[in-house]
Amino acid sequence: YEKFKRMMELAELPNTAMKLHGLGEIADRPGILQPDYQIENIPPFVEMAVEAFGPKRLMWGSDFPPSAGREGYHNALEGIRSHPALSGGEDAQEVMGRTAARVFGFGSR
């Protein structure tokens, strides 16, 4: 994970945020649209990103339409929403929308 580890160094810059998307792209590929796709098959990139950036500087992206042919949109969504590294609740809400709203200025009028 050397390239990903180097990317985590960007977290030292306080004005940077990171988008988590396409996790099925970096995981072992399941058969197309298997409902039992396990997010645990993904390398520890989410854990590394949460440790480096924290939930308030991470945002989820669907990677749709490519995710539809890999892990499926539902699995991509639930994989992050319920990821153990986000401990549910506030952390997951930050990643699933609040960070993007802050970064892009949504609702700031």
Which positions does each model-derived feature cover?
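Catalytic pocket-lining loop regions of alpha/beta-barrel enzymes
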Residues: 1-59, 70, 108
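Mid-to-C-terminal alpha-helical segments outside catalytic/metal-binding sites
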Residues: 47-48, 52-59, 68-109
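Active-site metal-binding loops of divalent metal-dependent hydrolases
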Residues: 62-64
